[in-house]
Amino acid sequence: MMESQVDRELLEKIADLIGKPVGAFNIRKDTGCDGRQSTENIQITGKTDGKSGIDIRIKDGTKGEQCHIPVIITKPGIQELVYNDFYIGENCDVDIVAGCGIHNCGGEDSRHDGIHTFYVGKHSHVKYTEKHYGDGDGTGGRIMNPQTVVYLEEGATIQMETVQIRGIDSTKRETKIVCGKDAEAVVTERLMTHGDQVAESDMEISLDGEGARGRVISRSVAKGTSRQVFYPKMMGNAACFGHVQCDSIIMDDAHIESIPAIVANSTEAQLIHEAAIGKIAGDQLLKLETLGLSPEEAEECILKGFLA
């Protein structure tokens, strides 16, 4: 596994990796595998059906282990479609850290479309973190279009955190989660756009089983002339509980649309949605400025706290 300074910076940004990961990992770089390691309980293998990507199989009862599967692109002009499938056994408790970083110093677009599908066994808990980051001084675009599909069996839970740090010119995120009996999905989405960037998020959580629970927490900041559109949808098909909360800060000449939807197909479904868009309150800025912060520092402090 050979790493340049650019590689190291991208891996630290998107996966908090410094040096070789501990445990199971697969590092994808510029369409190829730059390093892979399995463990006794987590097996990572390349696709055998002609598609690009990997299969991750986690044994029943695996607890306290991490699996890192970051993707980095360091060359302009790369366009890739990757399929990663996760088969998680019963009674597991694992952390999966993904993410994609694009460094583009050229004139051609670089694009990563990643399709992740999770099959989570009974009474297993998965924490899944996915961060996106882009940099480089080229004129070519940095484009990411992730798709995540999750199937939760009885009593299974997933805690999903998706973060777009900065530097992604265009993204369309699609998320679908199906919850069985007593299953729970908690999705936290954090996003910042600036310049003329465009971000769209289409999310659907289907609460199919009795006792299923779903929660969506979306927080975003739009600066410059950037554009954000959110479509979170919670469907209650049994005795279940679902909550959607979308909060956004709009600045400059940006545009934000937040269109939450709740759909009940059972008289026993309890569903709530909340959405708010606003600017930074002037009294918040003034308070921090009286403590010695410049207007720019005060603004940055508020935004960090909001997205934390």
Labelled PLM ranges:
Residues A24-K29, C33-L286, T290-L293, L303-A308:
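Conserved beta-strand/loop scaffold segments within soluble protein domains that form the structured core
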Residues M1, K287, E296-E297:
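Sequence-level preference for short, compositionally simple segments enriched
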